[in-house]
From Swiss-Prot:
One of its GO terms (biological process) is nucleotide-excision repair. It comes from the Bacteria. It is found in: Cytoplasm. SMART domains: GIYc, HhH1. This is UvrABC system protein C. Residues 201-236 form the UVR domain. Interacts with UvrB in an incision complex. SUPFAM superfamilies: C-terminal UvrC-binding domain of UvrB, GIY-YIG endonuclease, RuvA domain 2-like. GO terms for molecular function: DNA binding; excinuclease ABC activity. Keywords: Cytoplasm, DNA damage, DNA excision, DNA repair, Excision nuclease, SOS response. HAMAP family: UvrC (MF_00203). Belongs to the UvrC family. The UvrABC repair system catalyzes the recognition and processing of DNA lesions. UvrC both incises the 5' and 3' sides of the lesion. The N-terminal half is responsible for the 3' incision and the C-terminal half is responsible for the 5' incision.
Length: 610
């Protein structure tokens, strides 16, 4: 039993971080404190604040502390420990994907495109947007409003005449010198920049001036073009709520909580416009109060700087934060600009945004509760069918290829909450006879399971998308494993498609019973299995298509020694693309600038035998 009195005797009255461990030496909670002794003493009073704290204290085996220079340093260190260890009793942010941005490249003819990741590419970044869909929607809108290019640089460099985008009025064709005016292209780029900065009024003023100048010069075709642009921008304005107040960049956060599930909804406001929104469902230990949830979520969300999140000028939240001043100082230091946090007395348009965030949070939570109930019903049905006391983790495998080429295997993971997408995996299958799905499945299973697995990562069920042959190969593969974990734990189940390959006609092959089961089409257990199988199928197909597309787009020139990027570009340009290169004679290849006779022979021979 943990001797709290002896431990507390040596804890100093200094700021720092503490880590609580259980008997398995696993970190179960990470916290920080302005005064470590006072904070840690509060856990061992006779009357504890909540049942959650009681459960936490009952599991403490030992505690480690790290003294820091300041509360600010403790805050940063705390979130690093939480992110690294994912402790059981901490609120955990599950979705830590980086946000997409719109990038306006630094180029003679700038390109506008979506971007996610570290901002290493030179150019101007606008955002963040809540998801890739919001970026695509904005890019589609921009292409209709402002005719600047969105094509890849490699495509742009190899054009000898305008593409379809020019013909339908969505690009000025800067790739072809005789078709565009540099001044007009620069003008359109500037309009895009102003539009993305939220300065719609300046965009319209500029276009009105251009329209009037064109009319005075009797260039009525250009005047009509500018008129249409003005109408399009105004139509976009009418669809958006734009604040009359002068607002900086804001993130508006509202928290809804019911039946042990929390929804944190964020509105991203930039230049007075709502760029988009996103709902998060953090993992919340039982009996967690909302103030702790708010503190932990905001800290984790903005301090995970490796996710390339942009910290706004102001964060507005509808729950009081216990350490808003310290958190604002840390965020200001991380962001390189002043960051304020407002958790009370919100007025004006900001209160309207907060009300909107609250409505969205409550709606998203209601939907999530319904979905969770639905998922639990399906899980209960599957547990009853298989006579299992619990199902914590399920994995499913599928194989995808085209006539035996570019074979990819997928593994998707489900837990009690549904798809666990952070644990999804794909495996490139190599060194087998093309089209041998049994060998592909064996290789995928070996890649996945022939190594050490943590206890919680061992699946209770493994679904194999295939019939008796696939299941038997999977059983043989498992029998051959030499691993430290219990390889007998997972229940292997084959999911064979019906004769007509229609949903609802699947046959389940249960390995432990050595028999087939046909479930009725309205069975909740069958619906869960279909969901898992379809998810695995889609994941495999997506990976296969990417691999196939890569093989298709890689011209075959990449593997030829002596043919670098410039020579590839010259070959494609002078011979009319890859089809032209493959159809070219030896003499035609040799005539391309930079290609010697010897290199031309190598290129010709390689392509003829590929």
């Amino acid at each position: 039993m943990f001797d709290a009195k002896a431990f507390l005797a040596d804890v100093p009255h200094l700021p720092g971080v503490y880590r609580m461990y259980d008997a398995k030496n696993t970190i179960i909670y990470v916290g920080k404190a302005k005064d470590l002794k006072k904070r840690l003493s509060s856990y061992f009073r006779s009357q504890l604040a909540s049942k959650k704290t009681e459960a936490l204290v009952a599991n403490i085996h030992h505690i480690e502390t790290t003294i820091t220079h300041s509360e600010t340093e403790a805050l940063l260190l705390e979130h690093n420990y939480i992110k690294e260890n994912q402790p059981k009793y901490n609120v955990l942010l599950r979705d830590d994907k980086s946000y997409p941005y719109i990038l306006l490249t630094k180029h003679q003819h700038p390109r506008i495109t979506s971007f996610r990741g570290s901002k290493k590419v030179a150019g101007e970044y606008f955002g963040p947007y809540p998801n890739a869909g919001a970026v695509r929607e904005t890019l589609n809108l921009l292409q209709k409003l402002f005719p600047i290019r969105q094509c890849e640089d490699s495509y742009y460099k190899n054009r000898s005449r305008p593409c379809l985008q020019y013909q339908i009025g969505r690009c000025l064709a800067p790739c072809v010198e005789s078709y565009y005016s540099q001044a007009e292209y620069d003008n359109q780029v500037n309009l895009v920049r102003l539009f993305l900065q939220g300065k719609d009024g300046q965009v319209i003023e500029h276009l009105v001036q251009k329209m009037e100048n064109a009319a005075q010069e009797l260039d009525f075709e250009a005047a009509a073009r500018f008129r249409d642009q003005i109408q399009s921008v105004r139509a976009v304005q009418e669809k958006q709520f734009v604040s009359n107040e002068r607002l900086d960049d804001l993130d508006i956060i509202s928290i809804a909580y019911q039946h042990g599930i929390a929804c944190v909804h964020i509105l991203f406001v930039r230049h007075g416009k709502v760029l988009g929104n996103r709902s998060y469902f953090p993992k919340v230990p039982n009996n967690t109060d909302l103030s702790e949830l708010a503190d932990t979520f905001v800290g984790q969300f903005y301090l995970q700087m490796n996710q390339h999140r942009t910290i706004p000028n102001q964060i507005i939240i509808d729950q009081p934060l216990s350490e808003s001043a310290a958190l604002a100082d840390v965020l200001s230091e991380q962001a390189g600009h002043k960051v304020s946090i407002a958790d009370k007395n919100i007025r004006g348009d900001k209160s309207r945004y907060l009300a909107l965030a609250k409505t969205n949070a409550e709606a998203a939570l209601t939907l999530q509760l319904k979905q969770d109930t639905h998922i639990r019903q399906r899980y209960d049905s599957l547990k009853t069918l298989l006579n299992l006391a619990e199902i914590k983790r399920m994995e499913c495998f599928d194989i995808s290829h085209t006539m035996g080429n570019q074979t990819v295997a997928s593994c998707v993971v489900f837990d009690e909450n549904g798809p666990l997408k952070s644990d999804y995996r794909r495996f490139n299958i190599e060194g087998i006879t093309g089209g041998d799905d049994y060998a592909a499945m064996e290789q995928a299973l070996l890649k996945r399971y022939s190594r050490h697995l943590e206890e919680e990562k061992i699946p209770d069920i493994i679904f194999i998308d295939g019939g008796k042959g696939q299941l038997n190969r999977a059983l043989e593969t498992f029998a051959s494993l030499n691993v430290s974990w219990d390889k007998r734990k997972p229940l292997l189940i084959g999911v064979a498609k019906g004769v007509e390959r229609k949903a609802g006609l699947e046959t389940l092959l249960i390995s432990k019973w050595d028999k087939e089961i046909h479930l009725p089409p309205d069975s909740p257990a069958l619906h869960l299995i279909q969901h898992i199988r379809d998810e695995s199928h889609n994941h495999a197909i997506t990976g296969h298509r990417k691999k196939r597309q890569k093989a298709f787009t890689e011209s075959g020139l990449e593997s030829i020694a002596g043919v670098g990027a410039k020579r590839r570009q010259a070959l494609l340009k002078y011979l009319g693309g890859m089809q032209g290169v493959k159809a070219a004679t030896l003499e035609e290849i040799q005539s391309v600038p930079g290609i010697s006779k010897q290199l031309a022979e190598v290129i010709f021979d390689t392509l003829q035998h590929s």
